[in-house]
């Protein structure tokens, strides 16, 4: 199954695995799943690390390269279609990175691995 992993779930999987639910852990680690990673997540993490708002277990580039390699993550780029879709989303969620990830999940018709209950307002299948 194809699915998208959100930023927090990725951080927890790599650095604080014990915070994941069994459902989320299985979704992330099941080799039968194709796990997509939004370019929005890559950018969000870089910004937060650069602003010293987030500390990772390795330097950013090493951390990201290792996460992508270890999980076999498939990068999902930002496209005009995704950007356009997020313009029509209700304002339940204000974070621009999360709004783009929501739009990507909706356009692709895939579940999202996330602890964020606000996502339930968007009709996304949330795995947690």
Language model regions located:
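Short, well-structured N-terminal submotif of metal-dependent ribonuclease cores
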Residues: 1-37, 51-66, 108, 117-121
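Alpha-helical structural signal
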Residues: 24, 43, 64, 97-98, ...
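Generic structural signal for small/hydrophobic residues in well-ordered secondary structure
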Residues: 7-8, 45, 86, 105
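Active-site neighborhoods of divalent-metal-dependent phosphate/nucleic-acid chemistry enzymes
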Residues: 55-61, 69-115, 127
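Alpha-helix capping/helix-boundary segments
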Residues: 9, 41-42, 82, 101, ...
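Residue-level signal for well-ordered alpha-helical positions
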Residues: 16-17, 48, 89, 125
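Short glycine/serine/threonine-enriched helix-capping/active-site loop
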Residues: 37-40, 78
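Short, conserved active-site loop motifs that form the nucleotide-linked donor/cofactor pocket
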Residues: 33, 73, 124
């Amino acid at each position: 199954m194809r699915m998208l992993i959100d930023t927090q779930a990725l951080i927890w999987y790599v650095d604080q695995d014990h915070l994941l639910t069994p459902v989320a852990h299985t979704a992330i680690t099941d080799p039968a799943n194709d796990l997509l990673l939004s370019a929005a997540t890559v950018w969000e993490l870089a910004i937060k690390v650069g602003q010293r708002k987030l500390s990772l277990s390795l330097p950013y580039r090493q951390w990201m390269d290792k996460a992508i390699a270890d999980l076999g993550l498939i990068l999902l780029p930002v496209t005009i279609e995704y950007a356009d879709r997020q313009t029509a989303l209700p304002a339940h969620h204000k974070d621009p990175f999360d709004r783009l990830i929501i739009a990507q999940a909706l356009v692709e018709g895939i579940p999202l691995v996330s602890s964020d209950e606000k996502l339930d307002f968007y009709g996304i299948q949330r795995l947690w």
